[in-house]
UniProtKB/Swiss-Prot annotation:
PANTHER family: V-TYPE PROTON ATPASE SUBUNIT B. The lineage of its organism: Archaea, Thermoproteota, Thermoprotei, Thermoproteales, Thermoproteaceae. InterPro entries: ATP-synt_VA_C (IPR055190), ATPase_F1/V1/A1_a/bsu_N (IPR004100), ATPase_F1/V1/A1_a/bsu_nucl-bd (IPR000194), P-loop_NTPase (IPR027417), V-ATPase_su_B/beta (IPR022879). The keyword Nucleotide-binding does not apply. GO terms for cellular component: plasma membrane. Residues 95-114 are annotated as: Disordered. NCBIfam families: PRK04196.1. SUPFAM superfamilies: P-loop containing nucleoside triphosphate hydrolases (SSF52540). Keywords: ATP synthesis, Cell membrane, Hydrogen ion transport, Ion transport, Membrane, Transport. This is A-type ATP synthase subunit B. It is found in: Cell membrane. Component of the A-type ATP synthase that produces ATP from ADP in the presence of a proton gradient across the membrane. The B chain is a regulatory subunit. It is a peripheral membrane protein. It comes from Pyrobaculum islandicum (strain DSM 4184 / JCM 9189 / GEO3). Has multiple subunits with at least A(3), B(3), C, D, E, F, H, I and proteolipid K(x).
Length: 467
């Protein structure tokens, strides 16, 4: 049990999730303590601002019923640390790292600062090994790479929660399943969403290799800021100390940024773009940059954050700043979802900057780059022909153009679309890719190497298509 270093009874103000303490001396940024109200109930606090004779602390347990008068604050001279253990795998925690599954925490093997220790850029290793998610649109076109940070840009009402659950359930590093773990972090999610994730993880057995950190929308806003850091602290211990390949799925980073804006407003800071704090880019980087691989370390941390774009606006500060820090983005399309396609990826708007180095012979399959490049270029051309067909009519198109229309339909319905419980291997994904590409004439596949086309092209499919 921690011994208080200093106590203050000079709480000047309780403002939202924050308290202002006057006449402080020697209190440090990030220091933890507790505030005790007249009712005698202790609530954990963390210092987020230090002045010449004052300090501002966020109350992690919320300030409901906490008056300024009669409250005492104790500081311990330490930063917030998370007790970590391999036995956390299979557990469900709240945003503070406390049990949400009504079981005691396992004996700690170590205590880790929740703010983490940034990787020295010189010690970082370039990510080059793929993670198989079992989702064709990701594995085939925008492969997730071990050590990468690849966000999903979604919108309100789109099935990003289903995708998050499917990725947690299906993802694996081939050949090292026993060393693979998932850390799922729900940030500011509704009770209904939390029940969905808990039921899904337990029912499908995904929880056996996962740690779930669930912060609810009804929890204090300070916990919303803490939840991703708690999850990443557990991931860092599993990766750097125990050698696990850890996939961290965080949803929804928009809720995190809204919490950041609320805390910033409570502190009276000057707002930046659309009311968000000017340091939001730096703050997001402290989360996203905790992904990666390190020389001499067996494990890795891969981040798969999910955010909902307000009003589907990809230029909004949250997706805009996220795109600067991360290595690509997977964009969900409302139009595809309206056509009944799950997962509803916008193929043209999506990008994975590291995929090219993690696919091919010895990693996935020799034809992977050829399939990915050809599918994207052919689909882009097919969309242009679709627009043309709405103007002149399909009957007035040439036979090649009509082939592209058949290809686009098959690509969306057979390659992109798949079942929620359907898991496809890399080989199955690439085979489906060749099935839909073979609708086109062989001489149209100019983005694939001739020897690859000759080996994998299905001429019988080309001949069976009716125009």
């Amino acid at each position: 049990m921690l011994t208080p270093v200093v106590s203050y009874s000079t709480v000047r103000e309780v403002k939202g999730p924050l308290i202002v303490i006057e006449k402080t001396r020697g209190v440090s940024y990030g220091e933890i303590g507790e505030v005790i109200g007249p009712d005698g109930e202790p609530r954990k606090v963390q210092v987020i601002e230090v002045g010449t004779d004052y300090a501002i602390a966020q109350v992690l347990g919320g300030t409901l019923g906490l008056p300024a008068k009669g409250s005492t604050v104790r500081f311990y001279g330490k930063t917030l640390k998370m007790p970590v253990s391999e036995e956390l795998i299979g557990r469900i925690l709240d945003g503070k790292g406390q049990p949400r599954d009504h079981m005691p925490l396992p004996p700690p093997e170590d205590f880790r600062d929740v703010n983490g220790e940034p990787l020295n850029p010189y010690s970082r290793e370039y990510p080059e090994e793929p993670i198989e998610t079992g989702i064709s649109a990701i594995d085939g076109l925008y492969t997730l790479v071990r050590g990468q940070k690849l966000p999903i840009f979604s919108g309100t009402g789109l099935p990003h929660n289903m995708m998050a659950a499917q990725v947690v359930r299906q993802s694996t590093v081939r050949g090292s399943e026993e060393e693979f773990a998932v850390v799922f972090v729900g940030v500011g999610i509704k009770t209904e969403e939390a029940l969905f994730f808990m039921d899904e993880f337990r029912r499908t057995g995904a929880l056996r290799r996962a740690v779930a950190v669930l912060n609810l929308a009804s929890d204090p806003v300070a916990e919303r800021i803490l939840a991703p850091r708690v999850g990443l602290t557990i991931a860092e211990y599993l990766a750097w100390q125990l050698g696990y390949h850890v996939l961290v799925v965080i949803t929804d980073m928009t809720n995190y940024c809204e919490g950041l804006r609320e805390l910033s407003s409570g502190r009276g800071e000057l707002p930046g773009r659309r009311g968000y704090p000017g340091y939001m880019y730096t703050d997001l980087a402290t989360i996203y940059e905790r992904a990666g691989k390190a020389h001499g370390k067996k494990g890795s941390i891969t981040q798969f954050p999910i955010l909902t774009m307000p009003h589907d606006d990809i230029t909004h500060p949250i997706p805009d700043l996220t795109g600067y820090i991360t290595e690509g983005q997977l964009v969900l399309s409302r139009a595809m979802w309206g056509k009944g396609i799950y997962p509803p990826f916008d193929v043209i708007m999506s990008l994975s900057r590291l995929a090219k180095d993690a696919i091919g012979e010895g990693k996935t399959r020799e034809d992977h780059k050829d399939v990915a490049n050809t599918l994207i270029s052919a689909y882009s051309k097919a969309l242009e022909i679709r627009n043309l067909a709405t103007l002149v009519g399909e009957r007035n198109l040439g036979w090649r153009e009509r082939r592209y229309l058949r290809f686009a339909d098959a690509f969306e319905q057979k390659f992109i679309k798949q079942g929620y419980y359907e898991r496809r291997s890399f080989e199955e994904t690439l085979d489906i890719g060749w099935d839909v590409l073979s609708i086109l004439p062989e001489d149209e596949l100019t983005n694939a190497r001739p020897q690859i086309t000759q080996k994998f092209y299905r001429r019988h499919i080309f001949e069976s298509v009716k125009l």
